[in-house]
Structure formats: C-alpha cells, structure tokens
C-alpha cells in the first residue's frame, strides 16, 4: 500500500515550515491582543469608554472628519448621564481627547479581526491548517467576535442610568481578553514545540501551575472590580488600609457577601490579599521548578516568572501609593498579561508526552489507496 496526501503542503520542506508560519501568525495576534488590553486600560483610566454612544462595527471605523460631524458626536455624548452629572461644561477639544482612545480601542479590535481572519483563510486554502486545528482557530475567531459584542454590552450599561459601566461587565470583557490571549499563546506554543522535553516532577508541578493560573485569573477579575467601582482610590496606603488591615467599612452592605463584590473597601481588600496569595503560590512554583532540576528552558521561564511576579506586586503597590497614576496602572495591567503568558508557557513545558500520531499537526490525514478490484 502507498500513502496519498490531500495536502498541498505535503512536501517535507513546506510541511516543516507550515507549523512555524502559523505559530508566528498566532503570536502576532497574541501581541495585538496584548496591545488591545493596554489600550483598553488607558481608555478606562482616562474615562473615555462612554465617549462613543453607538455601535457601528463597519461604518464606525472612521472618526468624525468635519466640524459638523464632531459636533454631532459631542451632542450624543451630552445626552448621557456621565456628561450631565460628571462632565458638564466639557469643551469640544476635551471631548476629542477622550473620543480618540475609545475610537482607537474599537479600531484596534477591528484590525485584530482582519489580521486573524485573512491569514487563517490563506493558510486553510493552502492546506497548512489540519482538520484538527481548523475548529480551534475558527473557535478563536468566534471568541473575538463575541468579545466585540461583550465590549458593546459593557458600554451599553453606562449609557442610560449609570455614570459608568457595570463592573461585572467590565470584568467579563477583561476576562475574555485574557482568555483569548492565553489561548492564542497555547496554540502557538503547541505548534512551535509540539513535543517539549520531559521534565522531572512534571506530574507534581503541573497541578501547582494550574492552581497558580487559576488564582491569577481570580485576582485579575477582582482587579477589574477594583477598576470598575474606583476602589483603587479608597485606600492609598500599604500594607494597612486606614491604619488597619481590615477596615470596619468593609461590611456595611447587606447581604454580607455583597460587600466582596460591590463595597469599595472590601473589593480592594480582596484584590490585595488575593494578589499576595497568588504571588506566594507562583514563587513557590518557580522554586520547585528550580529545586527539582528542571531543564534549561523550564528554569529560564521559572526565573522570568519569578521576576515578573515580584515586579507585578511592586507595580500594584506603586499604583495604590500613587493614587492610581495612569502610567503605573496601565503597566500593572500589562504585568498581569506577562504573568499569564509565562504561566501558559510553564504549563506547556510541563505537559505530559502525547501519543505519537501518524500525521503531522498541520498536514492533512493521509489516505490509503484502495486495491484495484480483481
């Protein structure tokens, strides 16, 4: 019997190059998602998110191009509670400043969609995406579209009765961004390094790494709560809050559990101590990776992860002490993305060996010629 491949990329050189090309494209997309999260942080911190009051996925790509168009957009903004209660008297030039960040945030999201979709179609047509990988990539594209809808769902919450967006919807929007970013990295790493070298004590370190990533995710969600209800301004000292570890005003709302989600003092308290616990778990993971004699790459990633963890804690404290200075707060969100990426990389290096397959990840499954009938 002989094998016959349906893939145009079946030649040895193209089949070897295809995974790398697809992986590089996915890493570019992950980098764009990273930049998107940074732009989103600036948009939120400058209170620019409600400056565009309509959702026009196609025609909204262009900003106002004439004075009349600017005045029309400004008039729409003047109808919402944020302007009427908090920004009354804002000039047109000031409005243009906040409009820029929200417009850039939305434009960058559109660009990510284009940069993902067009190469995806190109790789697929050329046979460089396997049947196993195609649904994963299609799912990532759909997640990106869902993220755009979630963004508008979040903005909508601040256009009628509120002067800001729902912090629950903000957390959903931020969490989805981190999920897409982590998924892009995971798939890219799987293509670049489909069979990482076995690591000593990987079976013990893997649950530890998953626990660290889960804790980081919960800490990020509470960070979004802190941002959404301006809890970062409640107490700007460290480690005490108003001279005590746990201020009494943490428990002023009923039912009691609601304080953990909506009370500014309690939300900041939870984020602070979740961050401490997460940092300790991550640093413990890094120490264990070194102590068990992991390979050079695992040790290198663990060292970077430890350094990034210490830096992130420092950025969080500095953000508090600076009363949420925008450059520091933006860097703090970037630090969370770096930690996420390094933990995804760590988990990739710790993953169990896979059963060998007959087909390579990015080539079509070979067909077997049927014997001619006698």
Curated annotation (Swiss-Prot):
GO terms for molecular function: metal ion binding; oxidoreductase activity, acting on NAD(P)H, heme protein as acceptor. Its EC number is 1.17.99.9. It is an enzyme of class 1 (oxidoreductase). Pfam families: COX15-CtaA. It catalyses: Fe(II)-heme o + 2 A + H2O = Fe(II)-heme a + 2 AH2. It is found in: Cell membrane. It comes from the Bacteria. Its cofactor is heme b. The chain crosses the membrane at residues 22-42, 107-127, 135-155, 172-192, 209-229, 265-285, 306-326, 327-347. InterPro entries: COX15/CtaA_fam, HemeA_Synthase_type2. GO terms for biological process: heme A biosynthetic process. Heme binds at residues 271, 332. Catalyzes the conversion of heme O to heme A by two successive hydroxylations of the methyl group at C8. The first hydroxylation forms heme I, the second hydroxylation results in an unstable dihydroxymethyl group, which spontaneously dehydrates, resulting in the formyl group of heme A. This is Heme A synthase. It comes from Rhodospirillum centenum (strain ATCC 51521 / SW).
């Amino acid at each position: 019997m002989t094998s016959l491949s349906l893939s145009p990329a079946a030649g040895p050189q193209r089949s070897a190059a295809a995974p790398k090309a697809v992986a590089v494209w996915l890493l570019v997309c992950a980098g764009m998602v990273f930049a998107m999260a940074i732009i989103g942080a600036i948009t939120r911190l400058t209170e620019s998110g409600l400056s565009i009051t309509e959702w026009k996925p196609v025609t909204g790509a262009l900003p106002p191009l004439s004075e009349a168009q600017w005045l029309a957009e400004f008039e729409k903004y003047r109808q919402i509670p944020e302007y009427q209660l908090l920004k009354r008297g804002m000039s047109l030039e000031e409005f243009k400043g906040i409009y820029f960040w929200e417009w850039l945030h939305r434009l960058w999201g559109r660009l990510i969609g284009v940069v993902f979709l067009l190469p995806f179609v190109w790789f697929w047509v050329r046979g460089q995406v396997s049947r196993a990988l195609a649904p994963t990539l299609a799912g990532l594209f759909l997640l990106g579209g869902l993220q755009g809808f979630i963004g508008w769902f979040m903005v909508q919450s601040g256009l009628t009765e509120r002067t800001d967006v729902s912090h629950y919807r903000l957390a959903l929007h931020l969490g989805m961004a981190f999920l897409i970013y982590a998924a892009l990295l995971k798939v890219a790493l799987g293509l670049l390094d489909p069979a990482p070298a076995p690591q000593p004590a990987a079976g013990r370190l893997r649950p530890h790494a998953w626990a660290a990533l889960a804790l980081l995710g919960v800490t990020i969600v509470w960070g979004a709560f802190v941002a959404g209800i301006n809890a970062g301004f409640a107490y700007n000292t460290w480690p005490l809050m108003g001279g005590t570890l746990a201020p009494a005003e943490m428990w002023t709302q009923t039912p009691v559990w609601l304080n953990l989600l909506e009370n500014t003092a309690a939300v900041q308290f939870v984020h602070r101590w979740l961050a401490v616990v997460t940092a300790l778990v991550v640093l413990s993971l890094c120490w264990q990776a070194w102590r068990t004699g992991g390979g050079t790459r695992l040790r290198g990633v663990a060292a970077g992860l430890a350094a990034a963890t210490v830096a992130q804690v420092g950025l969080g404290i500095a953000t508090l002490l600076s009363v949420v200075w925008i450059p520091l707060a933006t860097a703090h969100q970037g630090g969370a993305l770096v930690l996420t990426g390094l933990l995804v990389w760590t988990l990739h290096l710790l993953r169990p060996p896979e059963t060998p397959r007959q087909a390579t990840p990015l080539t079509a499954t070979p067909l077997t010629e049927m014997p001619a009938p006698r």
